[in-house]
Amino acid sequence: MAGRSDPIPDEAAEWLAEEGVAGAAPRKGFPAARAEHRVSQQPAFVLHSYPYRETSLIIDVFTRDHGRIALVAKGAKRPHSALRAVLQTFQPLSLSWSGRGEVKTLTRAEWVGGMLPLGGEGLLSGFYLNELLVKFVAREDGHPVLFSHYVETLNKLAHGEPVAFTLRAFERVLLRETGFAAQLDRCVDGEPVQPDGDYVYHPERGIRRALPSDPSSWPVLRGQTLLDMERDDYSRPATATQSRSLMRFLLHYHLHGTPLSTRQILIDLQKL
């Protein structure tokens, strides 16, 4: 457990501006855009941390009710800081913060516990989840359903459940909860997906019947695959293969071709 009550330093906003974080700018000399914002004991996970000056960190956290938040953890790099041991990835935390603007100040951090640590391919997969959240979840945009699924996914990885199937399920929920994907068991025209039909996923509209004129880069999917994915059932070999192709396609499209470093490592290891 650790508590801090210092106001947000102007240098934190300057650091974010230098790092290219959208909306960040030095606060010195400008009126406050928003009133002081205080949040207490919010369930959260650390996604990533950045060194800030000699003794502090800026942490990117995923919270249950507030989405992604950037927090200054003052003194967290000191050898004997209580925060140093608490602010670890893949561990459930209870965080409190205050401030206005893009960056808030961490005022309290407590380790909640109750989850096994990740190891091996599960650990690498966890970093992949975090990279997806950083890319797709906007700051201060709450996603309680996605947060719950993130916790469930970490638990599955920690208990050694099949990595590929576990990640497919998370990718599907991520894209749906952030508004980038629709349901998979119904076409855009309202027609139910038929198990023996051939379909494509129009990246801006959703599922429809496959046509000869469709771009060759769009994977053709059997209806049974889509129905299986909607139920998170990846046990059929065809579903496992086609769902991987669909998720690669949608992630590539919505990231505008920007590669995910952790995903490429997993592909190289033939785990994804």
UniProtKB/Swiss-Prot annotation:
One Pfam family of this chain: RecO_C
GO cellular component: bacterial nucleoid
GO biological process, one term: double-strand break repair
Protein name: DNA repair protein RecO
Keyword presence, Protein biosynthesis: no
InterPro entries, A to Z: ARFGAP/RecO (IPR037278), DNA_rep/recomb_RecO_N (IPR022572), NA-bd_OB-fold (IPR012340), RecO (IPR003717), RecO_C (IPR042242)
Job description of the protein: Involved in DNA repair and RecF pathway recombination.
Family: Belongs to the RecO family.
Membrane-spanning parts: none
UniProt KW keywords: DNA damage, DNA recombination, DNA repair
Gene: recO
